[in-house]
């Protein structure tokens, strides 16, 4: 109940007041039932809202994200927790095993686990940054289907900003690494990390061109008014109390 009400309020603010516009394609590629892992390109703080906008209300989405970047004010923490669960990552905190355990708990309950393999906002507009293998390690150990999710237009925000997203057909680690025989390497081994890196490179090769295709759809003319550009772009990215501790 609170989740639906919070999402309705967020939709009103983002799409009614600020007038963000999102063009989403490929919803037919979402698995019809059961859990899955979303591997999404990362452009800005609006990205989780773009993902939630594209997904059905149920099952609920859980995000692996930066704790210091999110919990910068009590109201932000409440908003994020109400809209979708957050599994926070802290500097010098737990390793991949703990994140895999959390991801297993999420998918084990039939929910959606979302991770952005870039790990941070990086790369120029319209291009993805380097991908890290953590998401594919989680996919490998949980067996969750992987839904590639491309988006563009969230790196710079202003009133009426156009954005675009595209959901690609679901795949698996074996689908990304065609010559893998399907025998899982020992957890924590070099072989497992190498396999995850190969799957990560394959996912980046899929998402990169789609992000480049979507980017022109979000570009406004140079003389287009960009009201509140600085405030909106940095709305959720300002340093907070946890960054200073």
Region roles according to the model:
Residues 214-240:
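Short, highly charged C-terminal tails/helix-capping segments
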Residues 182-219:
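A contiguous, mid-protein "functional segment" used to position or interact
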Residues 242-245:
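C-terminal non-catalytic accessory extensions
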Residues 3-18, 77, 81, 85, ...:
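Short hydrophobic helices that act as membrane-entry/anchoring signals
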Residues 6, 10, 100, 104, ...:
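Short, amphipathic alpha-helical "lid/cap" segments that border enzyme active or binding sites
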Residues 20-194:
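Soluble catalytic domains of membrane acyltransferases
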